[in-house]
């Protein structure tokens, strides 16, 4: 049976991931870093906007012109991902110490305060009786309203975190946004080809004597992937 595309349900958001954009040129398709999960997704709202022009004459409307000029989106989560903040806001995560003395810090400084470009993809499972799942993909985004989160005391409810961004077309192919329906459920794809690897934070212990066992506490390694 063919998928029914006339009555798409919008229920059961299951996954939202973001991937930092590495490159976007007029000669090649964009490349992205490995996806980061925005855990605890509550909602993913996509809002295309139109520029409208109306031609008047003889005391009446003679014509109208409309064109999609921007696509805005808002994501709300029940928990905060430091790795997600690093992708959408910039900044840097650093680790220090080990075991009980371990400390993890996300920091935004004046030098890294420009939000990077990223891709965002959301997946929901209840899309229709003949549809396995549905995905929304925005290929080149930048935050327009940074994450806003509230921490309540024990008498209140759990806080949440939300941010708003704007999507724009990629340079070579003009990919902007896609709504993808799958006959069978598919997870958000994670690129399988590792193209590079870098050490973001060295291990706590870097000097050894002959015969000592390596200790990797504190080591943070980041890989770049290609579709």
Placement of each model-derived feature along the sequence:
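Mixed-charge, glycine-accented linear interaction segment located at domain edges/termini
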Residues: 137-190
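Polar/acidic, low-complexity leader/linker segments enriched in S/T/G and N/D
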Residues: 1-45, 190
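Oligomerization/assembly interface segments of phage tail-like spikes and tubes
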Residues: 60-85, 156-171
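Beta-strand elements of well-folded, non-transmembrane domains
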Residues: 77-81, 122-128, 140-145, 167-171, ...
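Exposed beta-sheet edge/beta-hairpin loop segments within beta-rich domains
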Residues: 64-66, 106-111, 127-130, 148-160
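Short helix-loop boundary/capping segments
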Residues: 93-142
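Beta-rich interaction/scaffold domains
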Residues: 191-227
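Charged, amphipathic alpha-helical segments
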Residues: 2-4, 80-110, 191-206
């Amino acid at each position: 049976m063919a998928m029914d595309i006339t009555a798409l349900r919008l229920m059961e958001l299951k996954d939202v991931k973001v991937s930092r954009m590495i490159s976007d040129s007029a000669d090649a398709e964009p490349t992205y870093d490995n996806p980061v999960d925005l855990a605890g997704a509550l909602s993913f709202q996509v809002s295309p906007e139109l520029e409208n022009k109306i031609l008047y004459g003889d005391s009446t409307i003679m014509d109208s012109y409309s064109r999609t000029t921007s696509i805005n989106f808002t994501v709300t989560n029940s928990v905060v991902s430091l790795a997600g903040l690093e992708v959408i806001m910039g900044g840097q995560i650093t680790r220090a110490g080990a075991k009980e003395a371990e400390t993890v810090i996300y920091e935004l400084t004046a030098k890294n305060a420009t939000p990077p470009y990223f891709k965002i993809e959301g997946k929901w499972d209840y899309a229709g009786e003949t549809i396995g799942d549905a995905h929304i993909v925005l290929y080149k985004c930048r935050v327009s309203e940074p994450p806003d989160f509230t921490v309540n005391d024990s008498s209140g409810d759990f806080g949440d975190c939300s941010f708003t961004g704007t999507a724009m077309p990629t340079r070579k192919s003009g990919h902007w946004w896609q709504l993808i329906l799958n006959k069978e459920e598919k997870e958000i794809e994670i690129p399988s080809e590792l193209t590079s690897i870098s050490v973001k934070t060295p291990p706590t212990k870097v000097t050894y004597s002959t015969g000592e066992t390596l200790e990797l506490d504190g080591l943070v390694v980041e890989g770049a992937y290609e579709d």
